[in-house]
């Protein structure tokens, strides 16, 4: 049998409570899987899976307004490890960048003293992963190096900046939301500030007038047009228009390029920035609850919306191909009429009051299948999306188009029997919305699903102050087997919260009183007394509540029975050292003494009894001598059984009978009534000493008042030391043995409480004042540490106690309870020292070498020919402690994830994708998503299952294409269809001539000449562009392929381009099918993204590949340095050998080796001498990197695969192995 152990280790920690209004937007969910939020001046870090507090960061001196986790969009290795970095900003303009795992500030940044409006890490991390952009009020944006705290540049703007948003598709695009409108910046760069003032636009809406209310009945396109009354203009709105200044939020849509949303309380506007117009409005019905916040998804075109009642809703864009027209109306000829987001799921609302309201929402950036709600009272509610297959009856009951589960899982289409985890991420839950007008492929098995929110995590904060705190009796050798470090916290609403201080979790919440708890005293390790008093009536009388609570059962008993109504309020309760007796002190009523064991009143003092200002029980008693007497009695009784009756004298017999009676009584009550004594002081400072034994109370001695002391407010007694505190801040130390006293003026005003630390011989004492606290050594009569509210300490102390012999507990008015070292310095702790109830999966907590070795262990299954998650079987000669930590991480994985990792049918590509999700590795997730898609496409084409179209994309992939959030990386055919759908919507929504002209330009580039001509002919005769548009319409319809006309148009186009009219020249070249030339011109003039777009929509696969390869060279150039983007473009082109070469040249050895293995499996490499050399070099370099991680077994595997290139390393590894086995 294992020895019974009790965990009583208590770490320094902070229990947090309700939030401050400034903390409203201070929350972020990192790629690392952790949620950070601001609570007053603290930053709290919790695990999203288990809802456990992992860290509380304390260094800010003011309220936190923003927190942001660093992005993980870079290649991780020993030099750039997995680490927990977080930036937090406060109302005084200070930004702190933290190493969260160690709990230390890496750097502090200060520019101005006004609240930081917004702060974000740059998402493109190829050049540097340390760049942080901040808004310093009123109108500055500053780029910082967050590693060193260096200011790189600063730029001011004309208007006050409220927030900003980076374009997730282009790192050079940044948009500012200002008090006046929106500013678009298109030349953002880490190396220098933006050049000009940016392009400023205003959002406005017409005034409602009778003319607007009497719109003619409209159908089709006009009907949709009338719904959009929002204009985006570069001029300030005129008097006829209302500027929409109440914009709550601005954000780019990560699901499709050049789209942005603007959030207003009652509507969400979707803008298409290509034509600068509103293409969709999500409005709330009149009775609906207004929006507070919206988070757009990237994996699917969906929106997480937070409403004012705390309800989170998920809206997903409707797919139109599955809607059948059932009405008698004529069906619309144009399939796309409206950009509609259907409500797909919503969670329960919270009860909103004056003090309890939703603050903010964050969404899991890795999987986009969970949202966390931060409530003002300190609660964190984690809602997870779950998918369920619809039953036939439930289908289409709501009237919205159905959602289907995707064909593939982790990037690869799987069979019906393959293990899947549909709730892994949003894109594994629901398939893509098909492009409008496109039917689902015949014969494909589509399962209709519906989504629901499930509350999977709840973290509750402390209620708002006031607090009365009391630590349970201390650990001793006698209670070591049952001891738990419990802290009782009395609250203002009458409940008592009991916290387990090893884990910091709420152990029990007990509703004990009907009003504020004034004090708590423990009567044993499992029971306590608490008291409260109602508001005084006109006579100053109250209803006193004194309850005895049994913790295991939660049962609460009125300790004083029916007493308590209409009497003077209880001032304090004091439990004797042996927990036998209770002294109850009232404000204007004599003292009561009670027996705790029997709940009986021993004595109510007479009315002449002096008023008590302070009282304390003595630690000395006569229990030991009583026990000795009891033992002697037992021995005498034992002797009595041996001696004959005749030999007994009459006197001895009567003594024995009395002792037997006493013994039986003691056994009945299971307790001996020992003599205990206490001291108290009156208003004059006189000290009284009383003795209590059984039901007798005796007055022992009186000590006259000390002239140097004011009115005594508190007493503490331990061993031979008695300490008194007074109203004037004096502490008087009495040495009872030496009969000397020493008065110390602390100059700290009223001494509110003094308490000795637990532990034999520990003479430390904590004293609490109005403005702070001090720890004293009463042996030396010296102050050990001090804490004073003020500039450096932002909180005021409400109550104090000792947690252990060397740690104190402070309850403060910021709603927090801090467990601190005796120095009382607020310090963060190392996260790996935390005692957690549930294991937490977070490889970021491991040392860098171990985190990377664990990743290799998961990726390269099976080991020793079998799939295993037991690392002890692996030849990994690190110290046992690290191996134990790795095994703990593996145990923390969910059973569903373990099942996938141990599945032999789970392919290498799927494993890479899953591990990138588990690690929250943004860079790897994007790489393996695109790699899996195109490698699988290639294998399908090679196997002959599909016909390869001339664009190079197998046809079956068009029914399961790469998500449009990957933009130009998608298959050409799918990309073209998406662009046509988009221009359809733009055409339907156009509301001005300017919009019409932009639509015409797009249609001409897309080759939709007939529709372009229709729009050109719509120009009215009084428009200044009427003549040009008419001629252009004639030109477009009469363009022939004859040599002379082509030559003329080409000459005009090149002249236009040379004279600064690039867009017009490109358009003319597209008219004569010279789109390849147009792309070259665009690239020459630096319009690389536009050239890629045009190549995708107009060129055949070979020409398109040429354009994109030139773009790759540009992206890899030192001045651009976007190699990670270049890798994705090469993957989309099927240039797999080039990808492997580039990965190797970038020293991404782990990714290169895995990619080579996947390519060999899918037959993606043409075998040649060069490729074989490349593969051997990659394997050898990867083996060396595994050796540097200490992962010898992995190093041996890849060194042996590298052939001649790995021979030396293999010999080296072999000799190391022999040395180890010999030792």
UniProtKB/Swiss-Prot annotation:
InterPro entries in UniProt: WD40/YVTN_repeat-like_dom_sf, WD40_repeat_CS, WD40_repeat_dom_sf, WD40_rpt, WDR11
Compartments, record wording: Cytoplasm, Cytoskeleton, Cilium basal body; Cytoplasm; Nucleus; Cytoplasm, Cytoskeleton, Cilium axoneme
SUPFAM superfamilies: Putative isomerase YbhE, WD40 repeat-like
Modification type Phosphoserine: residues: 205, 209, 401, 405
SMART domains on file: WD40
Organism field: Mus musculus (Mouse)
Tissue: Broadly expressed in various organs including brain, eye,ear, lung, heart, kideny and gonads. Cerebral cortex. The entire developing central nervous system, except for the spinal cord, reveals expression. Expressed in the neuroepithelium, including the diencephalic region that gives rise to hypothalamic neurons. In the adult brain, intense expression is restricted to the olfactory bulb, the olfaction-related piriform cortex, the granule cell layer of the cerebellum, and neurons of the hippocampal formation.
Gene3D superfamilies, A to Z: YVTN repeat-like/Quinoprotein amine dehydrogenase
A biological process term (GO) from this entry: head development
Record-given protein name: WD repeat-containing protein 11
Function in brief: Involved in the Hedgehog (Hh) signaling pathway, is essential for normal ciliogenesis. Regulates the proteolytic processing of GLI3 and cooperates with the transcription factor EMX1 in the induction of downstream Hh pathway gene expression and gonadotropin-releasing hormone production. WDR11 complex facilitates the tethering of Adaptor protein-1 complex (AP-1)-derived vesicles. WDR11 complex acts together with TBC1D23 to facilitate the golgin-mediated capture of vesicles generated using AP-1.
Subunit structure: Component of the complex WDR11 composed of C17orf75, FAM91A1 and WDR11; FAM91A1 and WDR11 are required for proper location of the complex. Interacts with GLI3; the interaction associateS EMX1 with GLI3. Interacts with TBC1D23; this interaction may be indirect and recruits TBC1D23 to AP-1-derived vesicles. Interacts (via the N-terminal and the central portion of the protein) with EMX1.
Phosphoprotein in keyword set: yes
Record has Secreted as a keyword: no
């Amino acid at each position: 049998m294992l020895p019974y152990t009790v965990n009583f280790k208590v770490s320094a920690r902070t229990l947090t409570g309700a939030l401050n209004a400034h903390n409203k937007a201070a929350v972020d969910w990192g790629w690392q899987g952790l949620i950070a939020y601001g609570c007053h001046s603290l930053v709290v870090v919790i695990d999203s899976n288990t809802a456990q507090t992992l860290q509380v960061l304390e260094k800010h001196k003011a309220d936190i307004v923003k927190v942001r986790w660093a992005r993980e969009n870079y290649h991780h290795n020993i030099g750039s490890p997995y680490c927990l970095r977080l930036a937090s900003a406060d109302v005084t303009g200070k930004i702190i960048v933290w190493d969260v795992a160690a709990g230390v500030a890496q750097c502090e940044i200060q520019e101005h003293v006004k609240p930081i409006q917004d702060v974000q890490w740059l998402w493109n991390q190829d050049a540097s992963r340390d760049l942080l952009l901040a808004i310093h009020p009123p109108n500055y944006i500053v780029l910082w190096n967050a590693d060193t705290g260096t200011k790189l540049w600063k730029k001011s703007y004309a208007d006050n900046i409220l927030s900003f948003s980076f374009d997730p598709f282009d790192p050079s695009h940044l948009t500012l939301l200002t008090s006046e409108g929106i500013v678009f910046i298109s030349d953002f760069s880490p190396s220098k500030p933006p050049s000009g003032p940016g392009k400023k636009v205003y959002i406005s809406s017409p005034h409602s007038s009778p003319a607007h209310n009497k719109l003619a009945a409209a159908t089709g396109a006009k009907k949709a047009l009338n719904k959009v009354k929002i204009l985006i203009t570069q001029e300030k709105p005129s008097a006829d228009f209302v500027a929409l200044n109440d914009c709550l939020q601005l954000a780019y849509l990560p699901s499709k390029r050049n789209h942005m949303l603007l959030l207003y309380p009652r509507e969400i506007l979707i803008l298409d920035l290509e034509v600068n117009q509103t293409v969709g409005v999500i409005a709330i019905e009149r009775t609906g609850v207004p929006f507070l916040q919206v988070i757009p998804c990237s994996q699917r075109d969906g929106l997480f919306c937070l409403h004012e009642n705390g309800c989170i809703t998920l809206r997903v864009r409707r797919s139109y191909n599955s809607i059948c027209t059932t009405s008698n109306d004529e069906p619309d000829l144009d399939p796309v009429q409206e950009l509609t987001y259907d409500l797909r799921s919503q969670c329960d609302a919270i009860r909103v009051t004056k003090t309890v309201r939703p603050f903010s929402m964050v969404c899991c950036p890795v999987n986009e299948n969970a949202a966390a709600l931060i409530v003002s009272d300190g609660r964190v509610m984690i809602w997870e999306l779950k998918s369920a297959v619809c039953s036939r009856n439930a289908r289409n009951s709501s009237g919205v188009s159905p959602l289907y589960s995707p064909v593939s899982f982790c990037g690869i289409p799987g069979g019906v029997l393959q293990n899947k985890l549909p709730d892994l991420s949003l894109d594994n839950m629901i398939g893509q919305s098909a492009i409008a007008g496109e039917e689902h492929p015949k014969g494909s098995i589509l399962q209709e699903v519906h989504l629901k929110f499930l509350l999977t995590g709840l973290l509750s904060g402390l209620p708002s102050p006031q607090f009365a705190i009391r630590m349970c009796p201390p650990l001793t050798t006698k209670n070591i087997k049952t001891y738990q470090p419990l802290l009782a916290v009395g609250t203002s609403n009458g409940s008592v919260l009991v916290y387990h201080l090893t884990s910091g979790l709420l152990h029990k919440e007990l509703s004990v009183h009907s009003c504020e708890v004034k004090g708590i005293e423990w009567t044993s390790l499992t029971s306590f007394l608490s008291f409260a008093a109602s508001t005084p009536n006109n006579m100053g009388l109250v209803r006193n509540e004194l309850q005895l609570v049994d913790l295991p059962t939660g049962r609460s008993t009125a300790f004083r029975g029916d007493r308590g109504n209409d009497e003077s309020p209880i001032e304090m309760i004091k439990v004797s050292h042996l927990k036998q007796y209770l002294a109850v002190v009232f404000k204007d009523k004599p003292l009561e003494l009670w027996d705790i064991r029997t709940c009986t009143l021993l004595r109510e003092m007479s009315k002449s009894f002096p008023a008590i200002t302070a009282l304390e029980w003595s630690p000395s008693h006569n229990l030991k001598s009583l026990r000795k007497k009891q033992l002697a009695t037992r021995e005498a009784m034992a002797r009595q059984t041996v001696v004959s009756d005749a030999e007994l004298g009459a006197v001895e017999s009567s003594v024995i009978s009395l002792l037997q009676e006493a013994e039986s009584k003691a056994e009945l009550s299971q307790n001996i009534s020992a003599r205990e004594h206490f001291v108290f002081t009156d208003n004059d400072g006189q000290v009284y000493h009383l003795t209590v034994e059984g039901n007798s109370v005796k007055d022992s001695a009186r000590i006259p008042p000390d002239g140097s002391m004011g009115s005594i407010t508190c007493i503490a007694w331990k061993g031979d030391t008695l300490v008194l505190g007074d109203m004037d801040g004096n502490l008087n130390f009495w040495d009872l043995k030496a009969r000397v006293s020493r008065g110390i003026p602390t100059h700290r005003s009223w001494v509110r409480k003094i308490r000795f630390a637990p532990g034999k011989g520990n003479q430390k004492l904590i004293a609490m004042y109005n403005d702070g606290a001090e720890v004293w050594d009463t042996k030396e009569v010296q102050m050990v540490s001090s804490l004073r509210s003020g500039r450096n300490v932002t909180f005021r102390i409400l109550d104090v106690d000792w947690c252990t012999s060397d740690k104190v507990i402070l309850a403060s008015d910021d709603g927090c309870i801090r467990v601190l070292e005796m120095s009382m310095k607020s310090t963060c702790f190392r996260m790996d020292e935390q005692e957690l109830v549930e294991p937490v999966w977070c490889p970021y907590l491991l040392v860098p070498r171990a985190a990377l070795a664990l990743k290799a262990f998961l990726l390269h299954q099976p080991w020793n020919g079998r799939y295993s998650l037991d690392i002890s079987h692996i030849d990994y000669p690190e110290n046992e402690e690290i191996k134990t930590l790795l095994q703990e991480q593996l145990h923390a994985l969910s059973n569903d994830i373990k099942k996938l990792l141990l599945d032999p049918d789970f392919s290498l590509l799927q494993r890479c994708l899953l591990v990138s999700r588990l690690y929250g590795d943004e860079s790897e997730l994007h790489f393996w998503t695109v790699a899996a898609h195109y490698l699988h496409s290639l294998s399908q084409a090679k196997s002959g299952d599909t016909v390869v179209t001339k664009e190079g994309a197998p046809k079956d992939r068009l029914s399961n294409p790469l998500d449009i959030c990957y933009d130009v990386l998608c298959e050409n055919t799918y990309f073209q269809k998406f662009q046509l759908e988009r221009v359809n919507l733009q055409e339907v929504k156009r509301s001005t001539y300017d919009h019409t002209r932009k639509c015409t330009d797009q249609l001409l580039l897309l080759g939709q000449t007939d529709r372009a001509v229709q729009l050109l002919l719509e120009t009215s005769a009084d428009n200044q562009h009427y003549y040009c548009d008419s001629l252009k319409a004639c030109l477009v319809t009469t363009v022939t392929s004859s040599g002379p006309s082509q030559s003329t148009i080409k000459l005009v186009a090149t002249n236009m381009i040379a004279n600064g009219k690039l867009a017009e020249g490109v358009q003319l070249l597209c008219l004569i099918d010279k789109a390849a030339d147009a792309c070259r011109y665009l690239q020459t003039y630096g319009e690389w993204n536009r050239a890629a777009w045009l190549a995708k929509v107009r060129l055949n696969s070979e020409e398109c590949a040429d354009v994109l390869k030139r773009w790759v060279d540009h992206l890899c150039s030192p001045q651009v340095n976007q190699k990670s983007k270049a890798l994705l473009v090469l993957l989309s082109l099927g240039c797999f050998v080039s990808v492997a070469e580039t990965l190797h040249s970038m020293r991404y050895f782990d990714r290169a080796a895995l990619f080579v293995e996947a390519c060999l499996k899918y037959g993606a490499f043409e075998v040649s001498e060069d490729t074989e050399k490349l593969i051997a070099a990659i394997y050898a370099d990867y083996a060396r990197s595994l050796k540097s991680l200490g992962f010898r077994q992995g190093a041996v595997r890849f060194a042996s695969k590298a052939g001649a290139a790995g021979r030396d390393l293999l010999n080296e590894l072999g000799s190391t192995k022999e040395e180890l086995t010999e030792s």
